[in-house]
């Protein structure tokens, strides 16, 4: 005699199928929530470290003196690593400030230290590539004061900066998300995302 019991091959009750399907659905929902939460967290961290570099120039310094200033400002919320910087005069790349002045304004221009420290016709330059610019900071990479000895050069450079000088800057966040900005003036709100910054054929040094 066979012992009484549940016969082999008994069809599963429909409730068992529903329970199994429900468990699978719950697992999928939990996985989706976890993925979306992780993505949202990454977006929040990226947004909290997002840099925005804007290149600009002016003809008056913070004291109101006649000084031509070329600056890079980080208007974002995170630090920016400057990978490359290019400056063009009439679409021709410049290697530095001296070449720019010789091309735009005075062919025989030479850099010379002023005899007096308080002379107004000073000329100061600095590099841009390789710098880390923190949020809210400004790097000034060229300054030229207006004096009696350099009035013609100063005015020529002022005309050039308003009409013929353009830039291309590539920078990255601390998470190595990178952007290229090529727009002049205030409309620099939509830099182009890139996988990595290209190496320029002619980079601006100083």
Label every model-predicted segment.
Residues 117, 123-128:
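Low-complexity, serine/threonine/proline-enriched polar segments
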Residues 3, 74, 124-125, 134, ...:
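Intrinsically disordered, low-complexity segments enriched in small/polar residues
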């Amino acid at each position: 005699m066979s012992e009484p019991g549940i016969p082999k091959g008994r069809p599963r009750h429909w409730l068992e199928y529903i329970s199994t399907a429900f468990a699978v659905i719950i697992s999928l929902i939990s996985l989706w929530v976890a993925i979306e939460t992780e993505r949202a967290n990454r977006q929040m961290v990226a947004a909290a470290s997002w840099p925005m570099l804007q290149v600009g120039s002016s003809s008056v310094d913070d004291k109101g003196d006649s000084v031509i200033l070329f600056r890079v400002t980080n208007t974002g919320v995170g630090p920016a690593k400057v990978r490359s910087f290019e400056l063009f005069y009439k679409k021709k790349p410049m290697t530095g400030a001296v070449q720019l002045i010789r091309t735009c304004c005075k062919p025989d221009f030479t850099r010379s230290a002023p005899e007096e420290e308080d002379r107004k016709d000073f000329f100061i330059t600095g590099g841009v590539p390789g710098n880390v610019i923190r949020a809210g900071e400004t790097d000034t990479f060229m300054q030229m004061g207006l004096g009696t000895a350099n009035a013609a050069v100063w005015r020529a450079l002022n005309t050039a900066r308003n009409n013929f000088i353009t830039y291309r800057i590539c920078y990255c966040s601390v998470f190595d998300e990178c952007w290229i900005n090529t727009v002049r003036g205030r409309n620099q709100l939509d830099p182009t995302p890139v996988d990595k910054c290209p190496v320029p054929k002619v980079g601006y040094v100083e």
